[in-house]
């Protein structure tokens, strides 16, 4: 289960391989850091944008994970289970293109998680002298981690809400997002977003009070309380 403070905020996991970090406005962009492959399809694409002022090469690496989080266990995916194309992209400044992911794994009722790392590599290695006399790259390699969720081929989207106890439970076999905004007039930044995997339970006192409370599943909003007029927030 993940919690995100501020429902419009995005927590990017960026790793600069060298000591200089590129400005976020001039680096790789891949959109939402969690994306899903729906149960009824075997294909999903992810758009990559080069926001730099010069050309970049993009590559990806995939690890199977038992469950997203700080203590996740990473393993090599079973051969042929999750394929992608192309092997790499070469994008000029401002260009964008798609990586495509193809699932050929089991068609059962279990949800599967993969950590997909997008690696942005400069086409040229520009360097400068550091104050200590060393050589530092001015265009670092950047790695952005995302999570691909393959929804079960036999999907069951189920949930329960108990207003008395302030509890939302994921009783199905696939993930969804819970948006909690305390009060009917609170801002997006005052809300919380929770990512509930199968079996996860959220207990929050705000769920017992009036507020805008939604589930987000397959980009659709589901209002779970009638204490405020319907006004769907952003899903980002």
Curated annotation (Swiss-Prot):
Induction: Negatively regulated by H-NS. Positively regulated by IHF and EcpR. Keywords: Chaperone, Fimbrium biogenesis, Signal. Residues 1-27 form the signal peptide. The keyword Transmembrane does not apply. Transmembrane segments: none annotated. Not expressed under classical laboratory conditions, but is functional when constitutively expressed. Belongs to the EcpB/EcpE family. Part of the ecpRABCDE operon, which encodes the E.coli common pilus (ECP). ECP is found in both commensal and pathogenic strains and plays a dual role in early-stage biofilm development and host cell recognition. This is Probable fimbrial chaperone EcpE. It comes from Escherichia coli (strain K12). The lineage of its organism: Bacteria, Pseudomonadati, Pseudomonadota, Gammaproteobacteria, Enterobacterales.
């Amino acid at each position: 289960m993940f919690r995100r403070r501020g429902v419009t905020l995005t927590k990017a996991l960026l790793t600069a391989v060298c000591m200089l970090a590129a400005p976020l406005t001039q680096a790789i962009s891949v959109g939402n850091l969690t994306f899903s492959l729906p149960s009824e399809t075997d294909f999903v694409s992810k758009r990559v944008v080069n926001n730099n002022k010069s050309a970049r090469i993009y590559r990806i690496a995939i690890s199977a994970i038992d469950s997203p989080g700080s203590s996740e266990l990473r393993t090599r995916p079973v051969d042929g289970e999750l394929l992608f194309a192309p092997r790499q992209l070469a994008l000029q400044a401002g260009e964008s293109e798609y990586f495509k992911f193809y699932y050929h794994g089991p068609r059962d009722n279990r949800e599967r998680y993969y950590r997909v790392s997008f690696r942005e590599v400069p086409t040229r290695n520009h360097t400068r002298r550091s104050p200590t006399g060393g050589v530092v790259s001015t265009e670092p390699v950047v790695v952005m981690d995302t999570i691909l969720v393959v929804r079960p081929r036999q999907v069951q989207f189920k949930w329960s809400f108990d207003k008395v106890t302030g509890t939302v439970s994921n009783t199905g076999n696939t993930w969804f997002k819970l948006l909690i905004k305390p009060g009917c007039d609170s801002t997006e930044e005052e809300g919380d977003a929770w990512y509930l995997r199968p079996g996860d339970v959220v207990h929050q006192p705000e769920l017992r009070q009036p507020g805008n409370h939604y589930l987000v599943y397959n980009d659709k909003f589901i209002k779970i309380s009638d204490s405020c007029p319907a006004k769907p927030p952003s899903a980002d």
